[in-house]
């Protein structure tokens, strides 16, 4: 039961519409799968623009079902924000990052996403799951929460250890939220690749 504690907001499932309607919170969350878009739910959402929908799916094509939910809301004229919930069972951080980025990236670049909610049923710390979510949001230009780095992979023209240089630059600048820093191995392609960076680090070139 939501007690009105500062910094917290109530969440409901689609079977709790009467309770949600009586709640006086300025912001409410509604967990809703695609199949729950009944006439009753649609009518409720039309009178409650403060509700943020959390789209859930267990369908084999989860991304397709998330898309279908948003398009159905749009066809009803609803403008409630939509957050996509994705459930994973990963033990390796890189596996989670790749799968979550592929899933959420498709929805973000469709322009359908207001937020993402990642849940991992495994041994990975919550901090890694949260960092993955924030990284995806930043890559999709939805929310900036940290310094952004642009780097080339390095090639035969790179005359220094690119990986260790990136690590040193990150250590010195990771607190500069919102800054975009380009780190390039040479002057040949570097300036073009980091054209939209705020600052750049470019190595020497072997011609």
Task: Locate the predicted segments by residue.
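Catalytic alpha/beta core domains of metabolic enzymes, predominantly
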Residues: 2-183
């Amino acid at each position: 039961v939501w007690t009105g504690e500062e910094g917290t907001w109530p969440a409901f499932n689609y079977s709790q519409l009467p309770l949600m309607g009586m709640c006086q919170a300025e912001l409410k969350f509604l967990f809703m799968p695609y199949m729950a878009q009944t006439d009753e739910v649609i009518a409720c959402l039309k009178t409650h623009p403060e509700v943020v929908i959390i789209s859930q799916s267990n369908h084999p094509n989860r991304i397709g079902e998330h898309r279908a939910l948003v398009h159905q809301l749009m066809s009803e004229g609803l403008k409630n924000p939509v957050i996509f919930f994705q459930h994973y069972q990963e033990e390796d951080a890189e596996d989670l990052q790749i799968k979550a980025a592929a899933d959420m990236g498709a929805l973000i670049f469709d322009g359908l996403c207001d937020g993402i909610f990642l849940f991992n049923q495994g041994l990975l710390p919550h901090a890694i799951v949260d960092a993955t979510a924030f990284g995806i949001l930043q890559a999709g230009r939805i929310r900036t929460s940290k310094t952004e780095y642009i780097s080339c992979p390095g090639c035969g023209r790179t005359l220094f250890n690119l990986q260790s240089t990136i690590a040193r630059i990150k250590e010195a600048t990771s607190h500069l939220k919102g800054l975009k820093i380009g780190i390039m191995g040479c002057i040949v392609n570097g300036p073009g690749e980091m054209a939209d960076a705020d600052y750049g680090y470019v190595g020497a070139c072997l011609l």
